């Protein structure tokens, strides 16, 4: 049976959807004002693995992941670049989708945009106001009265007294309490017209937290079976969501809360605010990038390496980014593909009941989506395939890899893609990229001719030349030679 660590209860619990066989899952998505970085990649891949395993377990999943398309950061980007809000958001939504496709992230069943649900947000604000949980401030904003919600802090484990001790009301603030947060922001004269909506409170726009309360309730109803997001959303965003939704409607917002761990860089979380981020496209693009093109050419070997780098780590554990860690991930993924290349698969599906590695894979995934343990089962199968040449083991390896969104490329084509993350490339300036496929095939043909002429010294010299350039040859029965980049 599947068990999930619930941030709310701080324990691992048996997962029981509110409606048998059906899962309503909401994940907080991107604020689209810039390119996605590797920390975003971790969240996207982590919850992609979650929804894949839920479906593989026979559950019907309604997966909603929102887009925040109105926000202070978006407004700043539009003003800085002289573009309309919609131009900014459409471009970065397209860029995000390109990143997701590159990483093998399946699209959510529904992907609502905040600006499509302003009416529903105003309805919730009205409910909160009628219950004394929201008030109109002197500056025209509508704020949530945190003091009126007794359970505030239950998700993050923070008490109101502790929170208030670290807060001060800013000079000129219209808040009654320093912890109160904005539900509706009054329009400012200097802000673009396409950031303003009519409301009972005058022209303005929604606060960030109210957006997810409206979209999750409208599309999935209450309670959600799973609500997820990145590590920095637990507080205040998800805490505020609970206060809004439960304050307005009563009952639980979500039965299970999931948060993936942070991606770390030198002991700090990767984030745009710290300036220590690397974008997804910088990491896996094939060729130059343009700031005017949302789409880009993807190196499929490097893209799968990045997904593998994320999947091999448990989603809740902090993960460290360093170039050498990507090299290690590339080498490990190459070993799995080498096993696939050495032996043809039998084409059979996964036998969960008979195969020990499949059972180990399932046990790991049922234990809070432990993809790290599942990857260990893949290496057991690869080891068996290399040791015995078992077509069954290779078939299981490919089928189980598919559950994690891995190992679906054609092995010869995979190895023919250059990579910046091999040990040779890191140490010698990517020599493997110096020869293109046509040049490599020509050298292989020369070697074959030398072997046919029994000039084995020449054949060995060509192999050595290619190896020095980062190209490994694999001679197969019947005179066929396959190649791969080291």
Curated annotation (Swiss-Prot):
The keyword Zinc applies. Keywords: Aminoacyl-tRNA synthetase, ATP-binding, Cytoplasm, Ligase, Metal-binding, Nucleotide-binding, Protein biosynthesis, Zinc. A motif ('KMSKS' region) lies at residues 269-273. Its EC number is 6.1.1.16. Coiled coil: none annotated. ATP binds at residue 272. It catalyses: tRNA(Cys) + L-cysteine + ATP = L-cysteinyl-tRNA(Cys) + AMP + diphosphate. Binds 1 zinc ion per subunit. Belongs to the class-I aminoacyl-tRNA synthetase family. This is Cysteine--tRNA ligase. It comes from Bordetella pertussis (strain Tohama I / ATCC BAA-589 / NCTC 13251).
